[in-house]
């Protein structure tokens, strides 16, 4: 996240503050701001993940105690957003827990392409998207004549906005459970059409791989996928690489390297 933060402030010519970080032998985190920031306006940019949650909270606390005027917190990527409700008895709504912690900071917050807006009942935040920047990286000849697809019902609103901005038709992949199998159905003819799959994040990539396979079977031509956050867990890159997806375009909100199939777009100057 350090790279994104540093690059984000370069174009504004805003100085980033020096900090001292460390981990004690017993595993406790140490955080200290090494500059005088009393009465100075401050913007904090940080992802929220399992690995850095405590460091983030300590940085906010340190800034407050040092007398800074924290104007806002910008969160390019927030973990646990998929845990937005109780799906099975006894579960924690971990996304709600994280948002409740952020709420107690009492600082304006901006989050980019959060997976579930249901978390707004736990935290009031400004939601922004980076998807229009990513879709512009798709060749114009593809964008002019294609179908925009939401990989699941939860992404229809997200994909719909992209489709509307490009004046293109929107299609939702409908999933029907038959016994232990989940069958995917399309509500439009994709034969001879180029496809843009729109999603907020790619994690295992399983749904995207299955969708691409079915799209090709139904006669689709070029398949492009755009997603703000590229998690690419496990063997997802390998599986996506074997799929018929022409190009996957993601932002650099997470640390990921470009490859033959994956294009990583720098969004630093759009974050702040």
Q: Which residue ranges define each predicted feature?
A:
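PRPP-associated nucleotide enzymes
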Residues: 1-272
């Amino acid at each position: 996240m350090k790279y994104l933060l540093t690059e984000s402030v370069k174009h504004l010519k805003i100085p980033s503050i020096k900090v001292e970080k460390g981990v004690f032998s017993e595993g406790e985190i140490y955080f200290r701001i090494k500059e005088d920031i009393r009465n100075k306006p401050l913007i904090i940019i940080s992802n929220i993940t399992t690995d850095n949650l405590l460091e983030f909270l300590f940085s906010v606390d340190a800034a407050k105690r040092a007398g800074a005027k924290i104007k806002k917190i910008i969160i390019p990527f927030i973990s646990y957003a998929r845990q937005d409700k109780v799906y099975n008895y006894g579960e924690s709504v971990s996304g709600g827990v994280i948002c409740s912690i952020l709420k107690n900071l009492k600082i304006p917050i901006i989050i980019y392409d959060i997976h579930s807006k249901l978390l707004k009942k736990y935290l009031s935040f400004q939601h922004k998207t980076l998807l229009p920047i990513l879709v512009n990286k798709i060749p114009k000849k593809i964008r002019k004549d294609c179908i925009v697809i939401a990989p699941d019902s939860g992404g229809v609103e997200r994909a719909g906005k992209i489709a509307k901005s490009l004046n293109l038709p929107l299609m939702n992949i409908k999933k029907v459970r038959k016994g232990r199998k989940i069958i995917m159905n399309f509500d439009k003819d994709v034969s001879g059409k180029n496809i843009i799959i729109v999603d907020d994040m790619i994690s295992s990539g399983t749904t995207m791989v299955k969708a691409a396979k079915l799209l090709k079977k139904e006669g689709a031509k070029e398949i492009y996928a755009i997603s703000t956050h590229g998690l690419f867990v496990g063997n997802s890159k390998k599986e996506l690489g074997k799929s018929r997806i022409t190009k996957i375009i993601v932002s650099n909100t997470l640390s990921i390297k470009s490859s033959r199939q994956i294009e990583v777009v720098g969004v630093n100057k759009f974050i702040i």
